[in-house]
């Protein structure tokens, strides 16, 4: 079908984590419940890492970030959810949203139930699904063959790892697999390459679903240089090759990137190269500009 718009689609699925996924979801929030985010759950730093070390469970920080960016009706509940403790006490640095999600996780049968309770409280229409409902961490093999455990340590590597994997081996959330199966459009990125994007692709069931889906797939590149040293050295072609290596098939049809990205070696896919930067924070995507670029990509794909 020609001239489809995002509003015509029944199911749009975005994968990733951190600020990047939240930005994509907020730029497409007009889709309401037709929009689904599959969220990385391997963070082990900051408030999230402290909660995991103390209480166990999945990482809630990326999920909280997505929920924060999807709030459209400010309320007492949203102010509480976004509150971060200051000072020097035991709660210093903790985000109340992380603690609320963890508390509801304790009160629920499944983490997904906790997320849906918070979504209803915050009046968030988009569906949000953790990539797995079991605790899992990212692990890498560095260029010396050493095992490097956890996102925080992997981001501090001087060179790209030889291999990345999840530990332990956990199943994907079944609703995440079903969302990919039902998708009309799939988006990957932006976000920290190794620690926000790759974890979802390392789950066997999600990789298999991405191999099988007929839905067009779009990779959204970062704006500016990554803070993670190993990821900062990767080119656009490197990233596309690595994602598809772990997925197991050439599946990415389109890349959406800013004007400073070298796309000269990307000759086998559609490239949408536009100004995407937000005026207030240059390395963040402007919601409307990103929305427009995705519309252009969808129409070019036909």
Curated annotation (Swiss-Prot):
Xref: SUPFAM superfamilies: CofD-like (SSF142338)
A Pfam family assignment: CofD
Gene Ontology cellular-component annotations: cytoplasm
Subcellular location field: Cytoplasm
Gene Ontology MF term list: LPPG:FO 2-phospho-L-lactate transferase activity
Gene Ontology biological process terms from the UniProt entry: regulation of cell shape
Keywords recorded for this protein, A-Z: Cytoplasm
Record-stated family: Belongs to the gluconeogenesis factor family.
HAMAP family named in the record: Gluconeogen_factor
Function in brief: Required for morphogenesis under gluconeogenic growth conditions.
Protein's name in the database: Putative gluconeogenesis factor
